[in-house]
Amino acid sequence: MDRRIFGIETEFGITFSSKDSRPLSPEEVARYLFRRVVSWGRSSNVFLANGSRLYLDVGSHPEYATAECDEIGQLIAHDRAGELILNELVAEAEKRLNLEGFAGSVYLFKNNTDSAGNSYGSHENYLIGRRGEFARLAEILIPFLVTRQLIAGAGKVHQNAGQANYSFSQRAEHIWEGISSATTRSRPIINTRDEPHADAELYRRLHVIVGDSNMSETTTMLKVGTIDLILRMVEDGVIMRDLRMENPIRSIREISQDLTGMAPVKLANGRVTNALEIQREYFEKVSEYLLTAGAHHALVPRIMDLWQRTLNAIEQQDFSSIETEIDWAIKKKLLDAYQAKNSLTLNSPRLAQIDLAYHDIATDRGLYYLLQKRGAVARVNEDGQAMAAIEAPPATTRAALRGKFVKAAQSAGRDYTVDWVHLKLNDQAHQTVLCKDPFRNTDERVDALIASLGTESDFSD
């Protein structure tokens, strides 16, 4: 599949800090955050004019799901737009809280764990063809996903019985199954619930829920880009060697805690290998594939270069070549410098605070964004691309239709209902358009539906 639909769903941690007022629970803060959303959308679950979905998930975690994207740079812009939209809601919530006697700051964190040990996720979505055996595809992908934390982990200082260690992944400790139809109870690597949000006869949605939330644009590029390349390779019939693990859930935890990448991993066939070797095998296979298939978009050479450099850095235990591009390495450099400067042990609360502050999405306060302003992290996009994505849906996918309809219905003051595939006017006729093709960005039926918004006789008052 040369052209693929991508999407990222991100759950955010939320808290309120104040020296003068009583503490507020995450549920209370989330209600303030979404008050404006509820006022115009009459719900805390809405689709926006940029084609995205914004809602309160289980546990009062704000969640932003990007619109359907068909380019990785476009996906990164829309993922970042979600942070900017939420920052606007934070500013309004803080004003409202202050008026009601709660002077303080609302914090949103793009991370995966809170201080109580709860986990919330970053879910990736990849459109794949219906043909082919999904179980076999999952078998091929799981060893890659278990070891992908080497190249895409967000990094975390883990505390255990007074001891602290730095790990590749925040999410690894909270994964309990290889594949499952659940997302919260058992937290699998791949979710198998068959909800394609497209023509079910043609497509299926690969729903990956094992990954960390990433601040770095280049890490997101690598995370999504490598999966896309492996999918493309498998779709073209390339055979992978059997890398199924004896116990992927045990392995994902052991790999996370070993920054050398050399922790032993026992495969189902009895062979013993390690995460670095497994990642190398996928890298070499994709490299070989690209010699004949060629790059299908402009970022492929950059993805392959960063993939190789990250594996080399881990093998050589010299992270200086990736400390502006890979989240766990960027954060580790910050922590190491602060720890050395202040003669701290790794279990210091001050280091835990830095670990958390890295994921603060406030652009004037979060450590990642302060690094970005100093030019200390690599970029994929310019700031203007994320700013534009706040209002404008991806122009090349079905999201363009949804965004145009939502904007028109809101401007006309009409009642409507939208999901990933349906556009519906809640009038007497209940006019509905079903958009089953996620690649289709023009549709005469949608144009007619929008045109009807201006025809008073079509609506009951």
From Swiss-Prot:
<feature type="binding site">
    <location>
        <position position="63"/>
    </location>
    <ligand>
        <name>Mg(2+)</name>
    </ligand>
</feature>
<feature type="active site" description="Proton acceptor">
    <location>
        <position position="57"/>
    </location>
</feature>
<keyword id="KW-0460">Magnesium</keyword>
<dbReference type="GO" id="GO:0016879">
    <property type="term" value="F:ligase activity, forming carbon-nitrogen bonds"/>
</dbReference>
<dbReference type="InterPro" id="IPR004347">
    <property type="entry name" value="Pup_ligase/deamidase"/>
</dbReference>
<dbReference type="GO" id="GO:0070490">
    <property type="term" value="P:protein pupylation"/>
</dbReference>
<dbReference type="GO" id="GO:0000287">
    <property type="term" value="F:magnesium ion binding"/>
</dbReference>
<comment type="function">
    <text>Catalyzes the covalent attachment of the prokaryotic ubiquitin-like protein modifier Pup to the proteasomal substrate proteins, thereby targeting them for proteasomal degradation. This tagging system is termed pupylation. The ligation reaction involves the side-chain carboxylate of the C-terminal glutamate of Pup and the side-chain amino group of a substrate lysine.</text>
</comment>
<dbReference type="GO" id="GO:0010498">
    <property type="term" value="P:proteasomal protein catabolic process"/>
</dbReference>
<feature type="binding site">
    <location>
        <position position="53"/>
    </location>
    <ligand>
        <name>ATP</name>
    </ligand>
</feature>
<feature type="binding site">
    <location>
        <position position="420"/>
    </location>
    <ligand>
        <name>ATP</name>
    </ligand>
</feature>
<feature type="binding site">
    <location>
        <position position="55"/>
    </location>
    <ligand>
        <name>Mg(2+)</name>
    </ligand>
</feature>
<dbReference type="GO" id="GO:0019941">
    <property type="term" value="P:modification-dependent protein catabolic process"/>
</dbReference>
<keyword id="KW-0547">Nucleotide-binding</keyword>
<comment type="similarity">
    <text>Belongs to the Pup ligase/Pup deamidase family. Pup-conjugating enzyme subfamily.</text>
</comment>
<dbReference type="InterPro" id="IPR022279">
    <property type="entry name" value="Pup_ligase"/>
</dbReference>
<keyword id="KW-0436">Ligase</keyword>
<comment type="pathway">
    <text>Protein modification; protein pupylation.</text>
</comment>
<protein>
    <recommendedName>
        <fullName>Pup--protein ligase</fullName>
        <ecNumber>6.3.1.19</ecNumber>
    </recommendedName>
</protein>
<dbReference type="Pfam" id="PF03136">
    <property type="entry name" value="Pup_ligase"/>
</dbReference>
<comment type="pathway">
    <text>Protein degradation; proteasomal Pup-dependent pathway.</text>
</comment>
<dbReference type="GO" id="GO:0005524">
    <property type="term" value="F:ATP binding"/>
</dbReference>
<keyword id="KW-0479">Metal-binding</keyword>
<keyword id="KW-0067">ATP-binding</keyword>
<feature type="binding site">
    <location>
        <position position="66"/>
    </location>
    <ligand>
        <name>ATP</name>
    </ligand>
</feature>
<dbReference type="GO" id="GO:0019787">
    <property type="term" value="F:ubiquitin-like protein transferase activity"/>
</dbReference>
<feature type="binding site">
    <location>
        <position position="9"/>
    </location>
    <ligand>
        <name>Mg(2+)</name>
    </ligand>
</feature>
<keyword id="KW-0833">Ubl conjugation pathway</keyword>
